[in-house]
Amino acid sequence: MTRTDVLNLTIREAAAQIERSALSPVELTDAMLQRIARVDKTLNAYITVCGEQAREVALAAEKMIRAGYHLGPLHGIPIAIKDNIYTRGVRTTAGSKILGDFVPQEDATVTARLKRAGAVIIGKTNLHEFAWGGTTDNPHYGTCRNPWNPERFPAGSSGGSGAAVAARTCLGALGTDTGGSIRLPSSVNGIVGIRPTIGRVSNHNVVPLAWTMDTVSPMARTVEDCVLMFEIIAGHDPLDDHSAQAPVPDYRGELGRGLRGLRIGLIRDYSLSHVQRAVGDTIRAALTTLESLGVEIEEIAMPSIQGNISAQLTIESCEPSTYHQEWLRTRPADYGEDVRTLLELGEMYLATHYLQAQRYRSVLRKEFVEGFKRVDVFVTPTLPFTATPCGATKVMIENNREEDMLSAIMQFTGVPSLAGLPALSVPVGFDADGLPVGMQVIGRAFDEATLFRLGHAYQQATDWHTRAPSL
Amino acid sequence: MSPHEPVTPESIDRLCTLADLPVPAERRKGLALMLAGLVAAANELSRKMADARYRTVVPILRFPER
């Protein structure tokens, strides 16, 4: 097997080869580390590369497997972890100067579960400072770049995880998603990312952004690989007060069920409105493919959907500013300019603004509950535009009108975040400049299985996910 | 702060005093420009949520709901 073949393996493919000793975890880890050495000077996807530690773990995995002990599909698989998720003994900066020297004494629950499953933690990925922003233009650890075009942004805040997976420097990664921070980079880097139902995956020992919206979850090149990681990290955690007791289904068992009879909802005057033409055309083509697989599509009105961006900005302003209150007074100069500004602004909302935004969430959630009586999932683009140039603070979506990046980037991903619903981003094509387009699929609370089933069926019928950036 | 008045650097000064947040004078103009837009949108949402049809709606502050 050539080096290129190894780099292009999915988790499922690599796991199958490792299990039958056709591929060594050490060989796989070394290939990833060499790939990081070659491309990450350009991409800046990693804040810390755990080279020596990763090799030791890979060697131990190899010995275990040779001795007849195979821990499952993540055994010996190189995985990257966003740098706001605790890793015992490995610096966890949250992309900040403030936590620049923080070395946790404990793992996050998600890290511990991946390690128990035999995963090889290959490094900690770059992010927007404290996950508060959507560009991964990090003033402390450098601007992260998009593997499909390094002049373009990888989105964020989990931009390092998105770029690392797309660039074949790891087989999967963990990200965090508050208002879209897994789905946005998954979309613009041409990979798959799932935001889980709040409570499905533990947030224990993850640096918070907004407590009532934060989630942790996988990013990978295929839906099936996301499932392999999700199965390991999902489930109740007594260390997290927000963790749900809901049983975790057999996601892999559900994947092959097909889509016949599945009902997709498009939200009237929203799902396909105010998007770049290439994005709209690509999503419509994806819907046509899904219809050929047996889904039915229905348009549904959701009158409360307008107002979602203000609600999200209000909550995502007030909650981080509460967490950062002390540092903002004692170390204001240690924040990057954009995050410092957002944290200062978050102190200037009224309590009534915050509570009205939380009441809005109840209304929005109720409309989704009603909508789910008629359809199984809702579809939107993940973003209304493709990757913008690095450093851009404005974006043009239609009519040659410039819009503020922060509001524009939340147009579609904020809605499931507010409603507490799971949402999957799956790659569905490219624009004329060769930049990926992602489709967001929103599901019922705790019904990630249907999202995985739809995304997997789509990937079985298309080949977008097999294309690689030419780095 | 009235929704009909623009947010000014002086408004920022007053809010910072209330929040016990020291913000250097040179930052206040930029913050005022941004806050004007954010507060206008938040006030619009508040007016919507004050409508009688939403009178019984309570905030979600915890997921999963109990």
Describe each model-derived feature in a short phrase.
Chain A
Residues 25-30, 59, 113, 277-301, ...:
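Acyltransferase
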